[in-house]
Structures are given as C-alpha cells and as structure tokens.
C-alpha cells in the first residue's frame, strides 16, 4: 500500500477517533487552537501524528527563512496536498524537532497577556458591534463573536451536508435537528478554539455535554463540514486578535 493511501486512511480513521466523544473532540481542538492557520484536514493529520505540535513548517521554510535545521532522525508530519491536479504528500516539522543555527530565529507565537484583555475586549466589541450584555468578560465577547460568525455563515458551511450523511449517525436525524445541532456544535467549537488560543479556560462557559452531538459526525465525510467551519471561522478571528495583541505589546526593556 502506498504512503499516500496510508495517510488517506489515517485521516479517515482519525476522524472516527476525534468524534468518538466530547473529550476526544476537545483534545483535538486543543491541538487545532495552536495551529489555527492550518486547514481542518491538516489539523486533523497533525493531531494524529504529533498532537503536542505548536508551530509547524516545511523543511525549506525552517532552513531558508528561520535558519533552523531539522534534527537528525526527526519524522516529518505527512499532510495531504490537494492543490495540484493530483493529490500528493507534503511534510511539515514541528519546531520541537528543529534547532537554531547562526542567525536563526523562532517564529512569533503571540500570547495574550492579562493586561491586554481589556483592549482585546474593546476591539472585539467595536469590530463585531457587540451588545453591552456580551461584553461583561472577554469570554462572553468571544462566545458572542463565535455565535455571530456561525450564524452569518451557516448556509455556506451546511451546503452539501445532506448529500454526505449516508452511512453516518446523521442519517437518522431530520433536517431541522441536523441544522440546529450543527449550529450549536460549530458555535461552541469556534468559541473553544478562540478561548484556548487566548489562554482562557473555555469550560468556564461550556460543559463537556455541550459537545455530545459530535458523535453523530462519525465519518470524515460529515465531520469535514463541521471541522472546516470551526477551523476557517476561528482562523480569521484569531489572526485579528493576534495582530491586536502585537499592537498592545509593551516594548522589551533595553
């Protein structure tokens, strides 16, 4: 069996694994929140092969841009590259599998500091026109933003799902239930990803049972709809938050 087919099979198998329980889905999202610039497909495969990864890049980028050498014996993380006419494999390496050489540097990985939270809250309230009731805490604001983004893009992310449910647990559910559960799962997943990446505890507003319907998405054919929604929506928000954090970062003392 080819390596390409092995990785395709791994994606299918791991989709079943991460949708096995609320805790499995949250464990996947812990990894995905750190790698929010990657697609759902990539996040899923990175979680399957290197769940503790924090910053991944190709060998060429590490060597030529960051002047970091990949450690001898390090195993690349295989991802599916579907940008060309034929699917092929591409490999990335986590920063933990590299070391700096002369002139080397580390990628900027923003971290929200406690003194920045009020500024981020104000920024989100302005950009997303949040109501006052949604700005009591940063967690409230993140949940409101997640809810708004999912609501605004729901039709796009549901498009085609009805044709993919055959052979999954969604097959026995009616359209209204699928739509309602998808909206809630997507909202809670986006919020979880945002909260985790911002260094907050998502379980202050959520309970494990909020993800109970993830088990209905028991094949990659349907999980991809939810995963793509959560990944793409959280990415745009987190890029904005990251830029805002950088704006309000205090200069290092000289």
Predicted regions and their residues:
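N-terminal accessory/interface modules of nucleic-acid-binding and processing proteins
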Residues: 1-250
């Amino acid at each position: 069996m080819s390596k390409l087919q092995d990785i395709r099979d791994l994606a299918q198998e791991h989709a079943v694994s991460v949708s096995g329980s609320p805790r499995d889905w949250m464990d996947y999202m812990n990894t995905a929140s750190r790698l929010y610039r990657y697609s759902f497909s990539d996040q899923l495969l990175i979680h399957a092969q290197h769940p503790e990864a924090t910053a991944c890049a190709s060998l060429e980028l590490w060597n030529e841009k960051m002047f970091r050498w990949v450690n001898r014996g390090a195993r690349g993380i295989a991802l599916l590259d579907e940008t060309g006419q034929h699917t092929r494999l591409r490999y990335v390496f986590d920063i933990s599998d590299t070391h700096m050489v002369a002139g080397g540097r580390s990628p900027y990985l923003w971290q929200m500091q406690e003194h920045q939270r009020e500024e981020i809250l104000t920024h989100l309230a302005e950009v997303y026109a949040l109501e006052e009731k949604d700005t009591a805490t940063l967690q409230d604001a993140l949940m409101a933003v997640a809810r708004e983004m999912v609501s605004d893009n729901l039709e796009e992310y549901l498009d085609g799902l009805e044709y993919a449910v055959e052979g999954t647990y969604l097959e026995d559910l009616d359209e209204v239930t699928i739509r309602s559960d998808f909206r809630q799962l997507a909202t809670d997943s986006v919020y979880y990803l945002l909260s985790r990446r911002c260094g907050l505890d998502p379980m202050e507003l959520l309970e494990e049972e909020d993800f109970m319907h993830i088990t209905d998405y028991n094949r990659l054919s349907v999980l991809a709809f939810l995963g793509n929604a959560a990944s793409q929506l959280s990415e745009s928000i987190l890029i904005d938050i990251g830029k805002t954090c950088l704006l309000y970062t205090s200069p290092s003392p000289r």
